[in-house]
């Protein structure tokens, strides 16, 4: 049975070659390590960073006579992930042995699921943009399946000049392999897909998504074709461990295949590796087919069966997911899709924003969280969990602005003080005399002084009203930024005789 093409060709995503346009076809197999205290079939710890071969049971080391026992928590996490992907949950699935030899695979086979996975078809919606008009395009990427499998160990080649070592701490750790349909048509779509998938599993608490630790990695399948033609021969780029590298690997591989085809060559179906230092892919081995692995049901494990009540109970307990929160931010708080997307990228950021926005203007809260808080966090290379400004403190700053106690400019200074020194914003304003000047007569005196000292600019302003901004700036400077900007603007217009 052939793969069905569900996407209509889109010229915006075509790649221009010497002999015409090409379309890149992308599918991904993402390996996500399940958050669980113990491994898929043993009680050994899954904690990251231990000394080599410290978290290894007799089962993980494939000692004779050791039988696997399924970890129920891993099954529960896989089903929760399937529900988060709007996927069909299979009440009966089967574990198979995937046979191949590699030094870090002590059993000589991997326990996986082939014909009957625990999770069937689902979908993820990604947003691409904004375009020059500020619009986003929503694209649905199909999920073909999600199955459970064991991770292999780790081969270490850089510790000795003539020997390699094997660390089995990772051997037997539970993985979800999430297989997409070949629905992506650009590196941007692939990066958006990986980002969205990582966000979903983090919201669900089923995988930490830490690609730098290897707990989430992608095998990227890339092929090219002329628009409207059948799919071309695909190459698989193995174990890409960052979203940026996924984009770079696809860009290089698509160009490589196009160059071969335009020279009259043929694409070999093969497995390739991405060399991040060189920004290119290189051949690793010929690509295996399913029959090469000689799959057969694992005789040591019964079929995995559970009832619909088990699935329904997990569905009820699911947290609110990014798409739902984003829709709520847009529809109930009036945020733009762009701002809402930034705020839901991480659960901790969404929670922080909601606390700040509670009882306040949502747009104003979003501006402060996105521009000021996240800007400061990025500058100091901190995560949201490390912020020195609590939601209550940022909320208090916004309240002071809305009350007219401080101006927007003073608020920026106040935020910096709270960021560096902490404290109650309201108390800091009192102690440091940061309240904005609202006394009309005091502001009027400052305006009169600026106007009388700049008669040449007064004449220019009547011909060029945009110079009003210069006068407002001078008054704000003269008052130390404490004057109410709206009042200053109105008084300047009156004094200059400009409507």
UniProtKB/Swiss-Prot annotation:
Q: Which PANTHER family match?
A: GLUTAMYL-TRNA GLN AMIDOTRANSFERASE SUBUNIT B MITOCHONDRIAL AND PROKARYOTIC PET112-RELATED (PTHR11659), GLUTAMYL-TRNA(GLN) AMIDOTRANSFERASE SUBUNIT B, MITOCHONDRIAL (PTHR11659:SF0)
Xref: Pfam families: GatB_N (PF02934), GatB_Yqey (PF02637)
Name by which UniProt lists this protein: Aspartyl/glutamyl-tRNA(Asn/Gln) amidotransferase subunit B
InterPro entries in the record, alphabetically? Asn/Gln-tRNA_amidoTrfase_suB/E, Asn/Gln-tRNA_Trfase_suB/E_cat, Asn/Gln_amidotransferase, Asn/Gln_tRNA_amidoTrase-B-like, GatB, GatB_C_1, GatB_Yqey_C_2, Gln-tRNA_amidoTrfase_suB_CS
Q: Which keywords are on file for this protein? A: ATP-binding, Ligase, Nucleotide-binding, Protein biosynthesis
Q: How does it assemble?
A: Heterotrimer of A, B and C subunits.
User: What GO biological process, any one, is recorded here?
Assistant: glutaminyl-tRNAGln biosynthesis via transamidation
For this protein, the record's HAMAP family field holds: GatB
The UniProt entry, under NCBIfam families, shows: gatB, PRK05477.1-2, PRK05477.1-4, PRK05477.1-5
Q: Which reaction does it catalyse?
A: L-glutamyl-tRNA(Gln) + L-glutamine + ATP + H2O = L-glutaminyl-tRNA(Gln) + L-glutamate + ADP + phosphate + H(+); L-aspartyl-tRNA(Asn) + L-glutamine + ATP + H2O = L-asparaginyl-tRNA(Asn) + L-glutamate + ADP + phosphate + 2 H(+)
A Gene Ontology MF term for this entry? ATP binding
Residue pairs linked by disulfide bridges in the UniProt entry? none
The role this protein plays is: Allows the formation of correctly charged Asn-tRNA(Asn) or Gln-tRNA(Gln) through the transamidation of misacylated Asp-tRNA(Asn) or Glu-tRNA(Gln) in organisms which lack either or both of asparaginyl-tRNA or glutaminyl-tRNA synthetases. The reaction takes place in the presence of glutamine and ATP through an activated phospho-Asp-tRNA(Asn) or phospho-Glu-tRNA(Gln).
Q: Which PROSITE patterns match?
A: GATB
Source organism phylogeny:
Bacteria, Pseudomonadati, Pseudomonadota, Alphaproteobacteria, Hyphomicrobiales
Regarding protein family, the annotation reads: Belongs to the GatB/GatE family. GatB subfamily.
Q: What is its EC number?
A: 6.3.5.-
Q: What's the source species for this entry?
A: Bartonella quintana (strain Toulouse) (Rochalimaea quintana)
Question: Is Lipid metabolism given among the entry's keywords?
Answer: no
């Amino acid at each position: 049975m052939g793969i069905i093409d569900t996407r209509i060709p889109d010229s915006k995503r075509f790649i221009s070659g010497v002999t015409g346009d090409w379309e890149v076809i992308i599918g991904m197999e993402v390996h996500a390590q399940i958050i669980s205290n113990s491994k898929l079939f043993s009680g050994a710890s899954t904690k990251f960073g231990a000394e080599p071969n410290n978290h290894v049971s007799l089962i993980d080391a494939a000692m004779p006579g050791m039988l696997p026992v399924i970890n129920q928590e891993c099954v529960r996490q896989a089903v929760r992930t399937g529900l988060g992907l709007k996927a069909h949950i299979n009440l009966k699935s089967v574990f198979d042995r995937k046979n191949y030899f590699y030094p870090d695979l002590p059993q000589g086979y991997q326990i996986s699921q082939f014909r009957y996975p625990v999770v069937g078809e689902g979908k993820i919606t990604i947003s691409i943009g904004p375009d020059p008009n500020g619009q986003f395009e929503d694209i649905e990427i199909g999920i073909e399946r999600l199955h459970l499998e064991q991770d292999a160990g780790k081969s270490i080649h850089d510790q000795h000049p003539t020997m390699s070592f094997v660390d089995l701490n990772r051997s037997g750790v539970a993985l979800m392999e999430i297989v997409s349909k070949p629905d992506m048509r650009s590196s941007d779509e692939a990066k958006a897909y990986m980002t969205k998938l990582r966000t979903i599993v983090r919201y669900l608490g089923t995988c930490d998504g830490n690609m730098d630790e290897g707990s989430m990695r992608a095998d990227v399948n890339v092929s090219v074709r002329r628009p409207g033609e059948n799919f071309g021969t695909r190459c698989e780029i193995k174990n890409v461990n960052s979203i940026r590298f996924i984009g770079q690997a696809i860009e290089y591989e698509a160009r490589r295949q196009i160059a071969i085809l335009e020279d009259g060559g043929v694409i070999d179906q093969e497995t390739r590796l991405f060399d991040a230092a060189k920004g290119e892919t290189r051949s690793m081995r010929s690509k295996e087919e399913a029959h090469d692995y000689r799959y057969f049901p694992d005789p040591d494990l019964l079929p995995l069966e559970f009832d619909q009540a088990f699935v329904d109970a997990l569905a009820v307990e699911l947290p609110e997911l990014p798409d739902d929160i984003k829709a709520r931010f847009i529809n109930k708080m009036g945020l733009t899709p762009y701002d809402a997307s930034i705020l839901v990228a991480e659960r901790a950021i969404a929670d922080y924003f909601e606390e700040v926005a509670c009882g306040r203007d949502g747009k104003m809260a979003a501006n402060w969280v996105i521009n000021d808080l996240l800007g400061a966090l990025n500058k100091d290379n901190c995560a949201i969990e490390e912020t020195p400004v609590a939601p209550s403190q940022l909320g208090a700053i916004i309240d002071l602005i809305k009350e007219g106690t401080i101006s927007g400019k003073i608020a920026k200074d106040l935020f910096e003080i709270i960021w560096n020194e902490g404290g109650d914003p309201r108390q800091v304003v009192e102690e440091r005399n940061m309240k904005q000047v609202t006394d009309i007569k005091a502001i009027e005196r400052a305006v009169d002084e600026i106007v009388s000292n700049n008669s040449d600019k007064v004449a220019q302003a009547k011909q060029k009203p945009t110079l009003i901004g210069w006068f407002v700036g001078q008054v704000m400077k003269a008052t130390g930024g404490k004057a109410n900007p709206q009042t200053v603007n109105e008084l300047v217009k009156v004094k200059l005789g400009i409507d």
